């Protein structure tokens, strides 16, 4: 695209011109160049908004979602500090365009599908509406006509709309100025997924929103970021997550619904204010539905109870019918909770399923529960809340039947009557509890029957359960036995059911639960010592009644005395406890006040930071305005220069033609580049006019030739018909001539064949004679060839034998040379190895010699130091003169280097060690190793020398 459309209004005009001629791609490129240009970052309402609207229309027409995203991002940089409402209008317009195009595509798809169906109906017989071709196509592709048209027409626009929602959400995330639009777009995206049943896109949308929330939490406190401490922000997030939860439930995506529940709970925990009762009621309703669909009746019942308590406390104008309906829901949900395996206290402590415990704790946190609920705790809470008095009378008896009465013979019959009543009710939500309550009734029946009968026929048990088939009842019994909830055994041979185990077998302790009559026989045998202890205690109490009574009286008197003795102290402790409680309350109040003060200071600090940021923004805008003013001055200077060029251009022929159609306003808006462009445009215009004239002339010639062809068409048709008649006559004549000639030729050939039959004997005799003569000649030549072949073979064999002999000699010679070379290399290697060993030995000896020299030098150095020390001491004791005498004695007696280096070298005789010549007379050795009697011998190395020196002093 040309780069000289620098002014935005010119680019918009140019884009409209491209659109008028059907070139949308160049129009989009022209607008994109203006949007991304850094020269036009100062926002102007009358210029930038029309450009963005036109730009987005082109993006929607061409389905360029990534180009639209880039344009919106650039426009956000332009107007977010000046007028954020303009960005909101542009985004809403973009989404509206995309949605309208998707709706139009859906309508077109439906019309096309119905038209194809109408065509199929009109074809062939009405008795066979489905043709074999249509059946094969539907079975092979798995699609009907509507699906195929949707894939072609609707799917591209649905994909574009999804990308539009995703890009807009990514653009608006974590920006407090467009927070409301962000949540509106998210809710529109949920409606889009629900309308077009886009399950995969819904999951991606939920993940994106979750990531956006994490980014918001990570970048708290930054300028223009969303503040989750603001109640309005939390409320908008809650509304969005509740809309997400509604959409997930409508699409039956229960995993996403549970994740949405966790998100809602997390937002509630972030909020410093408690949520509104309406929000909590909606939350509990959705959570109860999610738990019900997941089959978790325990937490479903718990959620129903929380909803019931919330509605009864918060809703002031609740009617008796609503209260009765809610209470019935709570009762049925609580009774539908499966009966858990009763555990003893020891078994409860031995349970180590950390995964299940963590899961239960996680679910309990969603309902703000401190402890994990159980069926017994839910029943107790229901009784404490006095739910039974509001329950429907037909449903009220269920609690008595399943939890209180011991009536195994008509329990299921009574429960079946209540279930039939629930099926006949107008409230369809009550019917979802029928199956769980029937299962609970069968469990209660089996437990009660096990306490009365040891063995019962299966047919009789079937008669007690009217709402289950034989297979369902058997499956129920097996499940109960598998969960170790009952000691039961099925005997298919006798078609009976046995309760209890052998008397000597008891796998676990039996804990009474529900209506209870008596224990199992094995349980009695297992607890026989406990029962004996109870009986003995009763006997002792009966025999020693007076003694035990007197002992209890003494204990009571002792307790009374202890109380009187410590009553004042206990009273004082209670008063002190009251004081401690009051102090604790005051401390908590002070902590709350301090927290509020800190929060107020934090908000105040945030306001100050916002004001500073706003001041920085204003300063930046002021600086930008100054830059714009200077840029405008430069543009004015350039404008004056351009006007001078225009005045000069008008004096030329090309310039006059180029500027004659322009208004003064357009001339005022031109710069130097525009002037050059106008000159080039005028030249191009003249060239185009010439080409247009040539094209017009060409069209005239084309029209004339076309008219001539149109006129000659009838004549050509007539000529063609005449040619057909003439060609047919010609073909018939030629065909008759061909047949006649063929007959004549056949007759001639027959006559020739009869004439040539007489020549056959002569032909055979000639061929035989020729064959005999040629055979003899062939045999002679063949024998000559064999002889020559044998001779050539012998010559070649001789040549090959000689070549092999020569090759063997050369190979042997080469091997001998290589062996000789290897021997020479081996000798050189051994010689080098020997030299290396000698060199290493010589270096080792030199190192040893150097070490000995170093040791000798060290010894000499120490000796000289010792002599100097002795001289110093002697000077201190006897004076300088005596020291000189002693020094002379030392020099004369010990033969130091008075005579120079030659004397020292002459005295270097003696043993130099084993490596220096051994005991040879001329071998060198250190002076301290020599034995010289006249110099003192060993006394030099001992204490005599020191003693002699002291004597001399």
From Swiss-Prot:
It comes from the Eukaryota. GO terms for cellular component: eukaryotic 43S preinitiation complex; eukaryotic 48S preinitiation complex; eukaryotic translation initiation factor 3 complex, eIF3e; eukaryotic translation initiation factor 3 complex, eIF3m; multi-eIF complex. One of its GO terms (biological process) is formation of cytoplasmic translation initiation complex. The keyword Protein biosynthesis applies. Disulfide bonds: none annotated. Residues 323-504 form the PCI domain. Residues 593-642, 670-704, 732-877 form a coiled coil. Residues 812-861, 895-919, 928-953 have a biased composition (Basic and acidic residues). Residues 603-623, 810-861, 893-953 are annotated as: Disordered. Keywords: Coiled coil, Cytoplasm, Initiation factor, Protein biosynthesis, RNA-binding. It holds the Pfam family PCI. It is found in: Cytoplasm. GO terms for molecular function: mRNA binding; translation initiation factor activity. Its main location: cytoplasm. RNA-binding component of the eukaryotic translation initiation factor 3 (eIF-3) complex, which is involved in protein synthesis of a specialized repertoire of mRNAs and, together with other initiation factors, stimulates binding of mRNA and methionyl-tRNAi to the 40S ribosome. The eIF-3 complex specifically targets and initiates translation of a subset of mRNAs involved in cell proliferation. This is Eukaryotic translation initiation factor 3 subunit A. It comes from Nematostella vectensis.
């Amino acid at each position: 695209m040309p780069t000289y459309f620098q002014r935005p209004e010119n680019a918009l005009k140019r884009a409209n011109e491209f659109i008028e001629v059907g070139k949308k791609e160049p129009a989009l490129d022209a607008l994109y160049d203006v949007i991304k240009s850094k020269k036009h970052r100062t926002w102007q309402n009358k210029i930038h908004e029309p450009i963005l609207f036109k730009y987005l229309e082109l993006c929607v027409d061409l389905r360029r979602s990534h180009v639209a995203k880039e344009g919106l991002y650039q426009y956000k940089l332009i107007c977010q500090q000046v007028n954020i409402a303009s960005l909101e209008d542009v985004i809403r317009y973009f989404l509206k365009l995309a949605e309208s195009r998707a709706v139009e595509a859906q309508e077109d798809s439906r019309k096309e599908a119905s038209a194809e169906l109408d065509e199929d109906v009109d074809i062939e017989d009405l008795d066979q509406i489905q043709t074999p071709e249509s059946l094969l196509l539907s079975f092979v592709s798995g699609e009907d006509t509507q699906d195929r048209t949707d894939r072609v027409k609707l799917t591209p626009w649905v994909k574009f709309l999804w990308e539009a929602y995703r890009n807009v959400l990514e653009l608006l995330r974590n920006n407090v100025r467009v927070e409301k639009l962000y949540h509106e777009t998210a809710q529109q995206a949920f409606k889009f997924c629900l309308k077009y049943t886009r399950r995969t896109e819904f999951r991606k949308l939920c993940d994106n929103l979750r990531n956006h929330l994490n980014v918001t939490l990570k970048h708290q406190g930054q300028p223009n970021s969303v503040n989750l401490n603001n109640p309005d922000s939390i409320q908008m997030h809650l509304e969005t997550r509740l809309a997400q939860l509604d959409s997930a439930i409508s699409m039956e995506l229960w995993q996403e619904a549970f994740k949405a529940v966790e998100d809602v709970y997390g937002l509630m925990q972030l909020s410093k204010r408690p949520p509104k009762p309406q929000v909590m009621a909606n939350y509990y309703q959705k959570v109860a539905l999610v738990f019900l669909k997941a089959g978790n009746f325990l937490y479903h019942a718990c959620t129903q109870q929380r909803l019931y308590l919330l509605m009864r406390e918060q809703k002031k104008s609740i009617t008796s019918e609503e209260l009765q309906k809610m209470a019935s829901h709570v009762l049925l949900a609580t009774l539908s909770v499966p009966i858990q395996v009763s555990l003893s206290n020891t078994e409860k402590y031995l349970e180590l399923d950390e995964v299940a415990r963590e899961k239960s704790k996680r679910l309990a946190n969603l309902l703000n529960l401190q402890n994990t609920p159980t069926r017994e705790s839910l029943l107790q809470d229901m009784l404490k809340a006095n739910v039974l008095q509001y329950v429907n009378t037909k449903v009220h008896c269920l609690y008595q039947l399943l939890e209180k009465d011991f009536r195994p013979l008509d329990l299921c019959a009574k429960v079946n009557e209540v279930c039939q009543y629930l099926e006949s009710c107008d409230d369809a939500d009550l019917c979802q509890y029928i199956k769980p309550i029937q299962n609970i009734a069968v469990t209660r029946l089996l437990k009660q029957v096990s306490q009365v009968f040891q063995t019962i026929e299966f047919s009789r048990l079937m008669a007690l359960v009217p709402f289950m088939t034989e297979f369902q009842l058997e499956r129920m019994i097996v499940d109960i036995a598998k969960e170790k909830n009952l000691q039961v055994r099925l005997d298919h041979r006798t078609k009976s059911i046995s309760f209890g185990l052998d008397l000597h077998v008891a796998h676990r302790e039996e804990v009474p639960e529900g209506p209870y009559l008596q224990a199992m026989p094995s349980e009695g045998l297992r607890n026989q010592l406990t029962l004996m202890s109870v009986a003995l205690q009763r006997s002792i109490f009966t025999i020693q009644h007076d003694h035990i009574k007197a002992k209890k009286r003494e204990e009571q008197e002792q307790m009374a005395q202890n109380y009187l003795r410590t009553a004042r102290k206990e009273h004082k402790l209670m008063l002190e406890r009251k004081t401690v409680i009051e102090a604790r309350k005051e401390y908590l109040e002070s902590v709350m006040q301090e927290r509020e003060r800190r929060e107020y200071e934090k908000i105040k600090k945030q306001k100050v930071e916002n004001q500073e940021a706003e001041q920085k923004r204003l300063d930046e805008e002021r600086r930008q305005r100054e830059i714009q003013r200077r840029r405008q001055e430069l543009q004015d200077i350039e404008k004056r220069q351009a006007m001078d060029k225009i005045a000069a251009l008008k004096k030329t022929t090309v310039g006059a033609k180029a500027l004659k159609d322009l208004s003064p306003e357009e001339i005022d808006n031109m710069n130097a580049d525009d002037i050059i462009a106008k000159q080039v445009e005028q030249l191009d215009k003249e060239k185009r006019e010439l080409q247009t004239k040539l094209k017009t002339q060409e069209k005239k010639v084309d029209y004339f030739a076309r008219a001539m062809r149109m006129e000659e068409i009838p004549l050509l048709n007539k000529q063609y018909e005449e040619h057909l008649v003439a060609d047919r006559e010609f073909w018939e004549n030629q065909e008759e001539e061909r047949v006649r000639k063929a007959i004549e030729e056949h007759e001639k050939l027959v006559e020739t064949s009869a004439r040539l039959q007489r020549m056959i004997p002569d032909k055979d005799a000639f061929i035989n004679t020729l064959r005999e003569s040629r055979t003899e000649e062939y045999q002679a030549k063949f024998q000559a060839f064999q002889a020559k072949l044998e001779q050539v073979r012998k010559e070649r064999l001789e040549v090959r034998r000689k070549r092999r002999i020569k090759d063997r000699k050369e190979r042997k010679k080469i091997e001998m040379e290589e062996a000789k070379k290897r021997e020479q290399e081996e000798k050189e290697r051994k010689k080098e190895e020997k030299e290396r060993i000698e060199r290493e030995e010589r270096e080792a000896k030199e190192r040893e010699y150097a070490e000995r020299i170093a040791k000798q030098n060290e010894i000499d150095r120490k000796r000289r130091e010792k002599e100097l020390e002795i001289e110093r001491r002697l000077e201190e004791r006897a004076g300088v003169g005596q020291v000189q005498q002693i020094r002379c004695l030392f020099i004369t007696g010990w033969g130091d280097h008075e005579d120079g280096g030659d004397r020292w070298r002459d005295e270097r005789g003696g043993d130099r060690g084993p490596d220096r010549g051994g005991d040879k007379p001329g071998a060198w050795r250190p002076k301290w190793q020599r034995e010289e009697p006249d110099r003192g011998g060993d006394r030099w190395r001992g204490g005599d020398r020191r003693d002699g020196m002291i004597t001399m002093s």
